[in-house]
């Protein structure tokens, strides 16, 4: 269907039920304004449901519509405030699924509020019965809207200056086991990992304040470890102190204590919610603190290809919200992440401007105006033997976190950290010399291991470890002469 079927005049407001596409939510001739927010949905209608009607219903139910005509529409600027589905395309190689492009007037949204944005776009429509499934694939956020957010509190450039580390990825490790250690033993892990050559250590998502280790005890032992490691190495170090708690008051208390102890970074979990994330980001900016976000819980709605919210959308929202770090995938690790899709996530985090790149799952141009860049974090099943692949796939503006790949080292935690640092330095040197480090990677690592026993042990221990599973979320990209130009 390529033409509008909107009913105009007094018939539009007659009491009763009317198809969404006839109420003005399907406007194929509409030209989106520069100030419109545009959402791309993957729509899977129920059998027998017209895909155009299903897409118009998504537009309606995510903006001004309800299930029946209401005369109070006439008390508003209804033509302006209705979301408008202006394009519906079949999804390549996915029968029964359709891409619906929907434009929203900027006045529908509160400035600087992810909670309000998400309440409109995904708040109600995902349970709509005429749909088998619905996924929010991407969004275009106009500069006028982007500028109402503070963006990352610190940003990549200032973080590097604060840490005094340039020209290479930063190295980190999540303390393992994530639960059960006493504060003293937890601090010992932090000290050995940092002294061995890592830049950061990290709490995991579910370490908060439990009977085996109170949060205050953990903070004290961790910062003692950081200070000792800094004194021993002469380098600036940090540990992500997870301030996630049951209330905002408790989170602020923990963040303030971390600041008093001299920490350069705190951590929160995605599950605390968008308003709490923005509140902590504002606190971090006021207090010159780097803010790390663990994407805990995201796969419950980002992983399935036909229903939920794409992680590229979450990455955009979190850059607006103001976090400095976000876990964004590894490509080669144990967690979900198609190479092309992951590249798109990293571009969203790190670029000032994103062109449309369908092969990376990016459907719209995105101008980030003056917002700081967001540092992506790679963690989950990575080890020193993959260093050449990680550098090639992810670049240098990234935190590489080797949890098991540090703490599981056969010679101990400090040796594991040293192995990762030596592997990284060897690869950076090869890159700076102009070598083809991706294809020569194994040779480069083997040569470095001749003078580094910890690296030799790491390469031997994990030489056969790979996670070669097919990704469940890949770009829906079918090259054509027009698309591939």
Swiss-Prot record:
Catalytic activity entry: 2 (2R)-3-phosphoglycerate + 2 H(+) = D-ribulose 1,5-bisphosphate + CO2 + H2O; D-ribulose 1,5-bisphosphate + O2 = 2-phosphoglycolate + (2R)-3-phosphoglycerate + 2 H(+)
Documented EC number(s): 4.1.1.39
Short name of one Pfam family: RuBisCO_large_N
GO BP terms, alphabetized: reductive pentose-phosphate cycle
Binding site for substrate: 124, 174, 178, 295, 327, 379
Cofactor note: Binds 1 Mg(2+) ion per subunit.
Alphabetic keyword roster: Calvin cycle, Carbon dioxide fixation, Lyase, Magnesium, Metal-binding, Monooxygenase, Oxidoreductase, Photosynthesis
Cofactor(s) demanded: Mg(2+)
Position of the signal peptide: none
Catalytic residues identified in the record: 176 (proton acceptor), 294 (proton acceptor)
Record-listed N6-carboxylysine modification sites: 202
SUPFAM superfamilies: RuBisCo, C-terminal domain, RuBisCO, large subunit, small (N-terminal) domain
CDD domains tied to this protein: RuBisCO_large_I (cd08212)
Annotated site residue numbers, Transition state stabilizer: 334
Function according to Swiss-Prot or TrEMBL: RuBisCO catalyzes two reactions: the carboxylation of D-ribulose 1,5-bisphosphate, the primary event in carbon dioxide fixation, as well as the oxidative fragmentation of the pentose substrate in the photorespiration process. Both reactions occur simultaneously and in competition at the same active site.
Note: The basic functional RuBisCO is composed of a large chain homodimer in a 'head-to-tail' conformation. In form I RuBisCO this homodimer is arranged in a barrel-like tetramer with the small subunits forming a tetrameric 'cap' on each end of the 'barrel'.
Quaternary structure annotation from Swiss-Prot or TrEMBL: Heterohexadecamer of 8 large chains and 8 small chains.
NCBIfam families, sorted: PRK04208.1
Protein family: Belongs to the RuBisCO large chain family. Type I subfamily.
Record-given protein name: Ribulose bisphosphate carboxylase large chain
Gene behind the chain: cbbL
């Amino acid at each position: 269907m390529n033409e509008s079927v909107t009913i105009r005049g007094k018939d539009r407001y007659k009491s009763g039920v009317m198809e969404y596409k006839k109420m003005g939510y399907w406007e194929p001739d509409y030209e989106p304004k520069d100030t419109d927010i545009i959402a791309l949905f993957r729509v899977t209608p129920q059998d027998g449901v017209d895909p155009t009607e299903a897409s118009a219903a998504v537009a309606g139910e995510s903006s001004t519509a309800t299930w029946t005509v209401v005369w109070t529409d006439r008390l508003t600027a209804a033509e302006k405030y209705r979301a408008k589905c202006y394009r519906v395309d079949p999804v390549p190689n996915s029968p029964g699924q359709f891409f619906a492009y929907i434009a929203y007037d900027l006045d529908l949204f509160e400035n600087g509020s992810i909670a309000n944005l998400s309440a409109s776009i995904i708040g109600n429509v995902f349970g709509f019965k005429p749909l088998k499934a619905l996924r929010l694939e991407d969004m275009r956020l106009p500069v006028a809207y982007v500028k109402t957010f503070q963006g990352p509190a610190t940003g990549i450039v200032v973080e590097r200056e604060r840490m005094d580390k340039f020209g290479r990825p930063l190295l980190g490790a999540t303390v393992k086991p994530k639960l059960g250690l006493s504060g003293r033993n937890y601090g010992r892990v932090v000290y050995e990992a940092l002294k061995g050559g890592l830049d950061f250590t990290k709490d995991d998502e579910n370490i908060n304040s439990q009977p085996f280790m109170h949060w205050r005890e953990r903070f004290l032992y961790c910062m003692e470890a950081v200070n000792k490691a800094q004194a021993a190495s002469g380098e600036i170090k940090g540990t992500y102190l997870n301030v996630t708690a049951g209330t905002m008051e408790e989170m602020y208390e923990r963040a303030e204590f971390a600041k008093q102890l001299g920490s350069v970074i705190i951590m929160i979990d995605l599950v605390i919610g968008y308003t709490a994330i923005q509140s902590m980001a504002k606190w971090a900016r006021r207090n010159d603190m780097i803010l790390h976000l663990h994407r805990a819980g995201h796969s419950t709605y980002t992983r399935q290809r036909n229903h939920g919210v794409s992680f590229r959308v979450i990455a955009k929202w979190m850059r607006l919200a103001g976090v400095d770090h976000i876990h964004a995938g590894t490509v080669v690790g144990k967690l979900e992440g198609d190479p092309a899709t992951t590249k798109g996530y990293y571009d969203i985090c790190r670029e000032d401007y994103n062109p449309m790149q369908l092969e990376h799952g990016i459907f719209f141009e995105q101008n980030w105006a003056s917002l700081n860049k967001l540092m992506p974090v790679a963690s989950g099943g990575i080890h020193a033997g993959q260093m050449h692949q990680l550098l090639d796939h992810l670049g240098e503006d990234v935190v590489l976190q080797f949890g098991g790949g540090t703490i599981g080292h056969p010679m101990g935690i400090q040796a594991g950290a040293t192995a990762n640092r030596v592997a990284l330095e060897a690869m950076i040197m090869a890159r700076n010399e102009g070598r083809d480090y991706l294809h020569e990677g194994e040779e480069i690592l083997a040569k470095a291991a001749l003078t580094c026993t910890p690296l030799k042990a790491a390469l031997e221990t994990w030489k056969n470890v790979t996670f070669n599973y097919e990704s469940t979320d890949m770009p829906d990209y079918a090259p054509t002469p027009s698309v591939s130009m």
